[in-house]
Amino acid sequence: MNSNRCQTNEVNKFISSTEKGPFTGRDNTLSFNKIGSRLNSPPILKDKIELKFLQHSEDLNQSRSYVNIRPRTLEDQSYKFEAPNLNDNETSWAKDFRYNFPKNVEPPIENQIANLNINNGLRTSQTDFPLGFYSQKNFNIASFPVVDHQIFKTTGLEHPINSHIDSLINAEFSELEASSLEEDVHTEEENSGTSLEDEETAMKGLASDIIEFCDNNSANKDVKERLNSSKFMGLMGSISDGSIVLKKDNGTERNLQKHVGFCFQNSGNWAGLEFHDVEDRIA
């Protein structure tokens, strides 16, 4: 029995296949469906770390990575808030809302601040370069100053002054200088003459006042005689009567300094000691 069951008879297999009828493919549909279901079914994961990783990736795929912000247009920026139109049939609540509408609603911040554009700010922030890096789009090396270390040689005058013209100029300057000196000398002499005459008149008046004071205030005859016999009173008397006058010494070859002193009008001799210069040094 057992041996017969284990043996395979090819004839029996052929007969059994013919009894079933022609092949329609329905027998294999179930097997194909089973294979497809196995392929579509999620794999059996025994590792917990791998399971968490796949779950996290699914969450990332489902969530949006960025928010699409609709850019603002000129219509949005120029939009003005307006209250609803007045209606006779509106309720008291609508009337109160219309009255308090400007107080309850505030305009957007871009309408309050002039020259504010949020889109420009976002665009510029995206195009900014990192710290320390700059765009080289308009870079031009010719715009930088170039230091020239060349040493220039000094050259002489291309057209030197003619020596003949130089000599004529020097001669003209020397002539002008000499004429100016002569004018200064004449002016000094004129001024000295007038001042000398004024000083002589003042000296005569002073000498007369001294003599008059001594004569009137000397009660003692002995004192009066001593004053009259002194050289000082004799000089004051000669100055007051005009016998001694002031004279200017023009100097000599040995002594070029000029002096003003008393001299006798008739003889022209100096009254008193001769003038001597004192040197500014110690012997």
Swiss-Prot record:
Keywords: Cytoplasm, Membrane, Peroxisome, Ubl conjugation. The keyword Membrane applies. Its main location: cytoplasm. Residues 179-201 are annotated as: Disordered. Residues 180-200 have a biased composition (Acidic residues). It comes from Saccharomyces cerevisiae (strain ATCC 204508 / S288c). Involved in peroxisome biogenesis and the import of peroxisomal matrix proteins that contain the peroxisomal targeting sequence PTS2. Required for peroxisomal targeting of PEX7 and growth on oleate. It is found in: Cytoplasm; Peroxisome membrane. GO terms for cellular component: cargo receptor complex; cytoplasm; cytosol; peroxisomal membrane; peroxisome. InterPro entries: PEX18_PEX21_C (IPR056940). Changing S230F: Abolished interaction with PEX7. The keyword Iron-sulfur does not apply. One of its GO terms (biological process) is protein import into peroxisome matrix. Gene3D superfamilies: 6.10.280.230. Ubiquitinated in a UBC4/UBC5 dependent manner. This is Peroxisomal membrane protein PEX18. Pfam families: PEX18_PEX21_C. Interacts with PEX7; The interaction with PEX7 stabilizes PEX18. Interacts with PEX13. It is a peripheral membrane protein.
